[in-house]
Amino acid sequence: MTRRLIVEPRGLASARLRILVPVLSVLAALVVGGLFLAITGENPLDVYGKMLDAAFGSANGVSNTLISATPLILTGVAAALAFKMLVWNIGGEGQFIMGAVFASGIAIWLGPGAPSWVAIPAVIVAGGVGGAVWASVAAVPRVYLGTNEIITTLMLNFIALSFMNFLIFGSSSPWRDPAVSTFPSGRPIPDTAKLPEFFKRLDIGIFIAIALAVAAWWLIGKTRWGFAVRVVGDSAATARYAGIRVSKKILVVFLLSGAAAGFAGALYVAGPVGALDPRSLDLGLGFTGIIVAALAGLHLLAVIPIAILMGALNNAGPALQSIGVPAATVTMLQGAILIFAVAGEFFIRHRIRLPRREPVSVEMPDGVEPA
């Protein structure tokens, strides 16, 4: 007689388990990626060694890894904030783009005459406002009309991308560089609006991103308002019974999530890109932020090292092409990491066991004693 597996809630998972599962998820993804590379005729150890050297083997490699990680920290925070409330904001990509649009727009409007101490904060704040405004397009219907935020935020990504392309390729907007006539490109923002660099093209955006992630962690984990948010995320019915205004909390967190992604767009424009350039901004950083949040277990501080890991993977793409390995290998690894991270989250929340065997009782005929 076959015994069916029993899936039961684990309860509160230990800190060791929460650390071990993401590590094992990454290792499992590397094993699967290694099998794929071996099938295609590549030596997995050589490929992974090249990736590691490209990401951390030189000063330029470390700088490029941290540059790639900067927006991922904030798009990871954006996803983690929303998902903690069981709000499925899949629109980080569109909010990132609209943050870049708002940030570059305010930089161009202020012009080179504005001092850096005015221009840089204005650019960053404008990026957050842009992301929040774009998130509100999905947040308000979700809260007050009960619409499905997965569909609306996903569709808004493509609208934001088309809007950015229109500003540069399909119009004579202020965002388009009038000095370039051969192929349209974004107007460079003034130097006074750019983030100061301090190491091999690496700018202070990495510190701003880390500070914002820590601030989000403190807000959610250490304040009375954050406690109410966590209650809503655990049980909306319990929160309503306790007198918490659930709809208001969901709306605010949704807007904060969009603002975090918008900050990422602002830092990318004011940092390595320096303009609203669709070719440099359409990188799927909002979608990668979902992987970062999932692998971090929605922990807002764990997002930081995970974003650096993903930045290292992104940075390794060009290095792989130099040895004949397709750069799509990086995308495959990111997808494998996401799959194993989601599976790992299941095992954090649940345990699987076999049912216990019940003793079999045998009735003996009258007058017959068991041997």
PLM features: residue spans?
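Transmembrane alpha-helical segments in multi-pass inner-membrane proteins
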Residues: 255, 261, 265-335
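Helix-loop-helix "hairpin" substructures at the membrane interface of multi-pass membrane proteins
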Residues: 133, 199-276, 300-305, 371
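Single transmembrane alpha-helix segments in multi-pass membrane proteins
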Residues: 35-40, 50, 55-110, 124-150, ...
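Short loop segments and helix-boundary regions at transmembrane helix junctions
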Residues: 9-20, 83-92, 113-184, 219-224, ...
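Transmembrane helix-bundle core of multi-pass membrane transporters
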Residues: 59, 153, 157-222, 275-276, ...
